[in-house]
Amino acid sequence: MSYQGKKNIPKITSERLLIKGGRIVNDDQSFYADIYMEDGVIKQIGDNLIVPGGVKTIEANGKMVIPGGIDIHTHLQMPFRGTTTADDFTQGTKAALAGGTTMIVDHVIPEPGCSLLEAFDRWSKWADEKACCDYSLHVDITHWNDSVKQEVETLIKEKGVNSFQVYMAFKDLYQMSNTELYEVFTFLGEHGGIAQVHAENGEIIAEEQARMLEMGITGPEGHVLSRPEELEAEAVFRAVTIASQTNCPLYVTRVMSKSAADIISQARKKGNVVFGEPITASLGTDGTHYWSKNWAKAASFVTSPPLSPDPTTPDYLNTLLASGDLSVVGSAHCTFSVAQKAIGKDDFTQIPEGVNGAEERMSIIWDKAVVTGKMDENMFVAVTSTNAAKILNLYPRKGRIAVGSDSDLVIWDTDAVRTITAKTHHSAAEYNVFEGMELRGAPMLVVCQGKIVLEDGNLHATSGTGRFIPCSPFPDFAYKRVKARKQLAILKAVPRGMYDGPVSEFSPMSRGGTPSASTRTSPTKVPVRNLHQSGFTLSGPEEAPIRPAGRRIVVPPGGRSNITSLS
């Protein structure tokens, strides 16, 4: 891989650290052991370790020691209509570190028609200058042609990108047709990429938005009313279908509704290689706030797909996350100031979309899923760190506490209780969608690149110390099954003799129409009735057939069939 690292950027001076008496928790096991770190790498794990002098010793006192969190979905320093999101790479990564996350994966969003490579270089420069923790990049495909195809191949082979997002919404801007989705998924499947999808039916959303505005609904409630969860579920089903046909691993971002989550759950049970990503907000809050009398508060919840107005949705999504039907949690952290949100004060379609969640992500999951008994500590590590590392092909460098892994880890205090408020959070946004929530579980100490960056509530993060972590193609976590299926799915024609029977004559099919049959009729023998010819007539109703008296029509055993069933 030819990616060249940044130059003249501050480096974290790694410490020699020894964590003693901790309970190491990985996604597959928990055990008590000491950890010795040097040069940003875990060097030893065990009891009675022999370590050099000058080591800083940290007493974990039996507390959990977990891999640093990986936030697989952020939008930091994102340009939007001449402005940028409230949190740049410095502010956003500080918020992440404060919550126990030691690596983020940001989305590069090229303007339609612009070069993907140029956008990637621009985002890389911003992150190199400001990120306080390690980072990787997804690249969003906002248009599709031969030139873009070549750039995607370059990004995979030379730039360390293995995941690309496409959009099924945002009509006339980013939205792709089914044909384009098929072509993108096919190409990514051949080159070892992960197809990410923003799943909503953009065509119907556009119609519903216009209808809401015509009715005089201009506030944030119009956002959720114009985007019912069925439109998310339909798009997810369509994306799963196309990905299955192209044998490409699919990653559904922002799973916000029960219906969409159910589609993913059913697909996984059928063997589809699909990963679902609920976000911090969909696990921790709901869409009832869109009807708040406070416009600024209501607008702070505007994101797409919208948060579900069904208040039981977060608990439902946490249950599917705990069971493994949903795979990984991102924050989709994308914050705007009140003034920026007010761009859409008279038209909800103009409200900049995005919510906070990078800092709160791990505590929300612990409080809503682990404390409630839905999820154990090992699954907590899987959905906050390990699964993301595996999907991005970074495991076991990231997402695991093991000898040779990066020394990114967290001492997690299961007894800590904190109240979320915008007054003390590390984001620059004035609102926090989790305002007032009392959450159990928080980081007590955070080590990033072998250096303590959070201790006793004090953050010691340095702008520009984050490193770009390249992601290689064909991650086993997704592609082992795909490769096996490709070997079994070779299509072959059926050997048969030449057909030498009669052939009907038809006029050439016109585009957009149906073929016109010639005057020749299909061969029949008199007096046998031609069963291909309809006996239906518009001349009047036929007499109903006579039934013997007393005979009842009953529903067949098992009930009437339902051709709309997803099963």
UniProtKB/Swiss-Prot annotation:
GO terms for molecular function: hydrolase activity, acting on carbon-nitrogen (but not peptide) bonds, in cyclic amides. Keywords: Cell projection, Cytoplasm. GO terms for cellular component: cytosol; growth cone. At 16 hours post-fertilization, expressed in the presumptive nucleus of the medial longitudinal fascicle, the presumptive trigeminal ganglion and the spinal cord. Expression in the spinal cord is strongest towards the rostral, more mature, spinal cord, and weaker towards the caudal spinal cord. At 24 hours post-fertilization, expressed in the olfactory placode, in the telencephalon and diencephalon but not in the proliferating ventricular zone. Expressed in the epiphysis, the nucleus of the medial longitudinal fascicle and in the area close to the nucleus of the posterior commissure. SUPFAM superfamilies: Composite domain of metallo-dependent hydrolases (SSF51338), Metallo-dependent hydrolases (SSF51556). Belongs to the metallo-dependent hydrolases superfamily. Hydantoinase/dihydropyrimidinase family. This is Dihydropyrimidinase-related protein 3. It comes from Danio rerio (Zebrafish). The gene is dpysl3.
